[in-house]
Structures are given as C-alpha cells and as structure tokens.
Amino acid sequence: MIICNDSYPSVLDKIADMLTKAEVELVFVSNEEMREINRDKRGMDKTTDVLSFPLTYVPHFPIGSIVINTDLASSKALELGHSTDDEIALLFTHGLLHILGFDHENDDGEMRRKEISIMEHMGLPKSLIVRNGC
C-alpha cells in the first residue's frame, strides 16, 4: 500500500504489491525541494531524481519513504520519449528496491536486473530499460 502526498500513477500500486505487502510512503517534490533534502540528508548540495529512506520495521507502519523529483522525472521522460508516469514508475521501483535492501553500488547488477524484470512485467516502455545511470 502506498501513502502519498498527491495523486500518482496506478501502476505504482501494482509494483508495490509485487515487491512487498508493507506500506511505503511516496512524496513528490520539486528540483529545489529535492536539492534541499539531498543536502540535508546526504551532504550533497545538488538535486537528484529519487531518494529512498528505509525505516526500521515496525508492524503497521511504512517500511520507508520514497521521494521523487517530478521536475527531473518530467524532463527525463521528454528526453527519452516516454510519459512522466512511466518515468515515475521506474523511479518508484528504484527507490522501493533500495528500501528492500538492494544496492546497485555493490550488487553486481542484481538491482538493475530486478528493475528490468519489473518494467517488462508491467509492460512499460523499453526507453525505461535502455538508459544509463540507474
């Protein structure tokens, strides 16, 4: 189940249900808000597309928060030729996998393979899969 500060693409519910039965918080922010969060939480004074913040497991509470930069999601979607909702689906998947313990920095491609599998299973555009930096 997703707890969100705004409306969101319905495919996110399907992705969340595929990966976990726990609740996850989803927050949409602007470039400037994301820059502030990234600076305050990670010491990096720049914007980014998605951040995830896992929480210690407590029954009936969210397992973490996913923060998505809608400004960057929109511009990346335009650049790659798919919808903003599809870009948000990839960013949500990426953030949720981090919350669930995946780490693309150290997993020899396991997280990326999982993202590709989910994107294909959901019938999302190949432009989400064929890209750098995720």
Curated annotation (Swiss-Prot):
Function (record text): Single strand-specific metallo-endoribonuclease involved in late-stage 70S ribosome quality control and in maturation of the 3' terminus of the 16S rRNA.
Family annotation (PANTHER family): ENDORIBONUCLEASE YBEY, CHLOROPLASTIC
Reported cofactor(s): Zn(2+)
Protein name as annotated: Endoribonuclease YbeY
GO cellular component: cytoplasm
UniProt xrefs under PROSITE patterns: UPF0054
Cell compartment(s), UniProt: Cytoplasm
Any one GO molecular-function label of the UniProt entry: zinc ion binding
Record's cofactor remark: Binds 1 zinc ion.
EC number: 3.1.-.-
Family: Belongs to the endoribonuclease YbeY family.
Coiled-coil regions listed: none
Organism expressing this protein natively: Campylobacter fetus subsp. fetus (strain 82-40)
Gene Ontology terms: biological process: rRNA processing
Pfam families, alphabetized: YbeY (PF02130)
